[in-house]
Curated annotation (Swiss-Prot):
GO biological process: ribosomal small subunit assembly; translation
GO cellular component, one term: cytoplasm
Keyword terms of this UniProt record: Ribonucleoprotein, Ribosomal protein, RNA-binding, rRNA-binding
Family from the record: Belongs to the universal ribosomal protein uS19 family.
Gene behind this protein: rpsS
Name of the protein described by the UniProt record: Small ribosomal subunit protein uS19
PANTHER family: RIBOSOMAL PROTEIN S19P FAMILY MEMBER (PTHR11880), SMALL RIBOSOMAL SUBUNIT PROTEIN US19M (PTHR11880:SF8)
Functional summary from the UniProt entry: Protein S19 forms a complex with S13 that binds strongly to the 16S ribosomal RNA.
GO molecular function: rRNA binding; structural constituent of ribosome
Membrane-crossing residue ranges in chain numbering: none
Matches recorded under HAMAP family: Ribosomal_uS19
Keyword Ribosomal protein: yes
Length: 93
């Protein structure tokens, strides 16, 4: 079930402070965050946010089409290495 419209989007306070500080200063440095649950807001457009995936911070450049999504959607936590091919020739020998 989606979040109620009367509540508004959830953004962690520390992340919102960093974004507004960079907007006022006019800088676009990478903002590191562990807050994967925060929603992308229009004031984040043009910033690069380092979203933690459990191991490292994945740089995510925020565009207009990302508004309304959560930051965690853009930093996958699992790496799929692929299924190992079954080598039947080696087994026969």
């Amino acid at each position: 079930m989606p979040r109620s419209l009367k509540k508004g989007p959830f953004v962690d306070e520390h992340l919102a402070k960093k974004v507004t500080a960079q907007n006022e200063a006019g800088t676009h440095n990478v903002i590191k965050t562990w807050s994967r649950r925060s929603m992308v807001t229009p004031d984040m457009i043009g910033h690069t946010i380092g979203v933690h995936d459990g191991r490292k911070h994945v740089p995510v450049f925020v565009t207009e089409s990302m508004v309304g999504h959560k930051l965690g959607e853009f930093a996958p936590t699992r790496t799929f290495k692929g299924h190992v091919k079954d080598d039947k020739k080696a087994r026969r020998r």
